[in-house]
Swiss-Prot record:
Residues 54-55 are lumenal. This is Dolichyl-diphosphooligosaccharide--protein glycosyltransferase subunit dad-1. It is a multi-pass membrane protein. Component of the oligosaccharyltransferase (OST) complex. It comes from the Eukaryota. Keywords: Apoptosis, Endoplasmic reticulum, Membrane, Transmembrane, Transmembrane helix. One of its GO terms (biological process) is protein N-linked glycosylation. It comes from Caenorhabditis elegans. Subunit of the oligosaccharyl transferase (OST) complex that catalyzes the initial transfer of a defined glycan (Glc(3)Man(9)GlcNAc(2) in eukaryotes) from the lipid carrier dolichol-pyrophosphate to an asparagine residue within an Asn-X-Ser/Thr consensus motif in nascent polypeptide chains, the first step in protein N-glycosylation. N-glycosylation occurs cotranslationally and the complex associates with the Sec61 complex at the channel-forming translocon complex that mediates protein translocation across the endoplasmic reticulum (ER). All subunits are required for a maximal enzyme activity. It is found in: Endoplasmic reticulum membrane. Pfam families: DAD. The chain crosses the membrane at residues 33-53, 56-78, 93-113. The gene is dad-1. The lineage of its organism: Eukaryota, Metazoa, Ecdysozoa, Nematoda, Chromadorea. Pathway: Protein modification; protein glycosylation.
Amino acid sequence: MAAQVVPVLSKLFDDYQKTTSSKLKIIDAYMTYILFTGIFQFIYCLLVGTFPFNSFLSGFISTVTSFVLASCLRMQVNQENRSEFTAVSTERAFADFIFANLILHLVVVNFLG
Protein backbone atom coordinates (compact mmCIF):
# COMPACT_ATOMS: atom_id res chain seq x y z
CA MET A 1 0.00 0.00 0.00
CA ALA A 2 2.71 2.50 0.99
CA ALA A 3 4.70 1.59 -2.10
CA GLN A 4 1.77 2.74 -4.24
CA VAL A 5 1.17 5.96 -2.30
CA VAL A 6 4.70 7.37 -2.53
CA PRO A 7 4.86 7.58 -6.36
CA VAL A 8 1.40 9.13 -6.50
CA LEU A 9 2.30 11.81 -3.95
CA SER A 10 5.62 12.41 -5.69
CA LYS A 11 3.88 12.94 -9.05
CA LEU A 12 1.27 15.18 -7.40
CA PHE A 13 3.99 17.33 -5.83
CA ASP A 14 5.97 17.53 -9.08
CA ASP A 15 2.89 18.54 -11.09
CA TYR A 16 1.98 21.12 -8.45
CA GLN A 17 5.48 22.64 -8.65
CA LYS A 18 5.45 22.75 -12.46
CA THR A 19 1.92 23.91 -13.24
CA THR A 20 0.87 26.11 -10.31
CA SER A 21 1.59 29.83 -10.58
CA SER A 22 3.51 31.65 -7.87
CA LYS A 23 0.40 33.66 -6.91
CA LEU A 24 -1.49 30.47 -6.16
CA LYS A 25 1.46 29.02 -4.25
CA ILE A 26 1.53 32.07 -1.99
CA ILE A 27 -2.21 31.77 -1.37
CA ASP A 28 -1.76 28.04 -0.67
CA ALA A 29 1.01 28.78 1.84
CA TYR A 30 -1.27 31.30 3.58
CA MET A 31 -4.10 28.77 3.66
CA THR A 32 -1.77 26.12 5.10
CA TYR A 33 -0.69 28.54 7.83
CA ILE A 34 -4.32 29.32 8.67
CA LEU A 35 -5.21 25.62 8.70
CA PHE A 36 -2.43 24.80 11.17
CA THR A 37 -3.37 27.80 13.32
CA GLY A 38 -6.97 26.54 13.53
CA ILE A 39 -5.81 23.02 14.36
CA PHE A 40 -3.50 24.39 17.06
CA GLN A 41 -6.34 26.45 18.56
CA PHE A 42 -8.66 23.45 18.60
CA ILE A 43 -6.05 21.20 20.23
CA TYR A 44 -5.34 23.93 22.79
CA CYS A 45 -9.09 24.10 23.50
CA LEU A 46 -9.23 20.34 24.06
CA LEU A 47 -6.16 20.21 26.30
CA VAL A 48 -6.35 23.44 28.31
CA GLY A 49 -9.94 24.63 28.08
CA THR A 50 -11.94 27.43 26.56
CA PHE A 51 -11.63 30.08 29.27
CA PRO A 52 -12.22 32.86 28.26
CA PHE A 53 -14.71 31.48 25.78
CA ASN A 54 -15.10 34.70 23.76
CA SER A 55 -11.39 34.72 22.97
CA PHE A 56 -11.38 31.11 21.82
CA LEU A 57 -14.55 31.50 19.80
CA SER A 58 -13.46 34.70 18.07
CA GLY A 59 -10.02 33.28 17.27
CA PHE A 60 -11.41 30.05 15.88
CA ILE A 61 -14.11 31.81 13.86
CA SER A 62 -11.43 34.15 12.53
CA THR A 63 -9.27 31.25 11.31
CA VAL A 64 -12.17 29.40 9.68
CA THR A 65 -13.48 32.53 7.97
CA SER A 66 -10.01 33.59 6.85
CA PHE A 67 -9.55 30.15 5.29
CA VAL A 68 -12.87 30.46 3.45
CA LEU A 69 -12.01 33.95 2.20
CA ALA A 70 -8.60 32.75 1.01
CA SER A 71 -10.17 29.83 -0.84
CA CYS A 72 -12.56 32.26 -2.56
CA LEU A 73 -9.59 34.42 -3.54
CA ARG A 74 -7.76 31.35 -4.87
CA MET A 75 -10.74 30.39 -7.02
CA GLN A 76 -11.02 33.90 -8.47
CA VAL A 77 -7.28 34.29 -9.16
CA ASN A 78 -6.81 30.85 -10.74
CA GLN A 79 -6.42 31.14 -14.52
CA GLU A 80 -8.32 27.89 -15.07
CA ASN A 81 -11.45 29.55 -13.62
CA ARG A 82 -11.35 32.64 -15.86
CA SER A 83 -14.53 31.54 -17.64
CA GLU A 84 -16.41 31.51 -14.32
CA PHE A 85 -15.20 34.94 -13.15
CA THR A 86 -15.13 37.02 -16.31
CA ALA A 87 -16.33 40.21 -14.60
CA VAL A 88 -13.77 40.00 -11.77
CA SER A 89 -10.16 40.98 -12.39
CA THR A 90 -7.30 39.72 -10.24
CA GLU A 91 -6.88 43.13 -8.63
CA ARG A 92 -10.61 43.34 -7.87
CA ALA A 93 -10.56 39.86 -6.30
CA PHE A 94 -7.63 40.86 -4.09
CA ALA A 95 -9.33 44.13 -3.11
CA ASP A 96 -12.50 42.20 -2.19
CA PHE A 97 -10.37 39.81 -0.12
CA ILE A 98 -8.71 42.68 1.76
CA PHE A 99 -12.04 44.43 2.37
CA ALA A 100 -13.72 41.23 3.62
CA ASN A 101 -10.76 40.52 5.93
CA LEU A 102 -10.94 44.06 7.30
CA ILE A 103 -14.65 43.65 8.09
CA LEU A 104 -14.01 40.19 9.57
CA HIS A 105 -11.33 41.41 11.93
CA LEU A 106 -13.38 44.43 12.99
CA VAL A 107 -16.16 42.00 13.97
CA VAL A 108 -13.68 39.71 15.76
CA VAL A 109 -12.18 42.59 17.76
CA ASN A 110 -15.69 43.81 18.60
CA PHE A 111 -16.64 40.32 19.78
CA LEU A 112 -13.60 40.18 22.06
CA GLY A 113 -15.01 43.13 23.96
